[in-house]
């Protein structure tokens, strides 16, 4: 083996190492963004499932009057672990009573409770004692009093539970991709259950 072969072989290995470092430098940021995206997307899906389950469970409990008012909201907030619905979310529990007579045929809001410090409005409008807004036309019509021969509403009462959570990513991904999360650096997740 000559000295020329050894020198050329070493130069080739150094060139291959340099190319490998260049490939790593180009691919590493892409891999980091992908890993961060997978982590945050997984947490977002988990948060969405938790919010949906909390609203459904709350609707079920509220419709059966197992827990009411502040006790129900406290129980629902604690069931949302690991997400903090006290500071980063809001829960509304609204009971709507059907119309009861021809003189009072319209449904009305019987009670409304809420808990959590995040500033978001309920989709059910109106105050206690007033006709609710935000229900579908079909649901609203089922709550209206119907005169003879029925002389009643189709449904006597419904419970509406709305759960909102402001999801924020835990990775620095929003620093890499601008305008990824438009609402205060996060996404507002909401779910409504009617029982």
Q: What feature does the model see in each segment?
A:
Residues 65-107:
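Extracytoplasmic beta-strand-rich oligomerization domains located immediately C-terminal to a leader/signal peptide
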Residues 99-187:
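Intrinsically disordered, low-complexity regions enriched in Pro/Ser/Thr/Gly and acidic residues
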Residues 3-6, 26-30, 55:
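Mobile, glycine-rich extracellular loop/lid and propeptide segments
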Residues 1-17:
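N-terminal leader/signal peptides at the extreme start of proteins
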Residues 14-43:
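N-terminal single-pass transmembrane signal-anchor helix
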Residues 90-95, 160-164, 190-194:
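Soluble periplasmic/extracytoplasmic beta-strand elements of cell-envelope proteins
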Residues 41, 45, 54-79:
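N-terminal alpha-helical signal peptides/signal-anchor transmembrane segments
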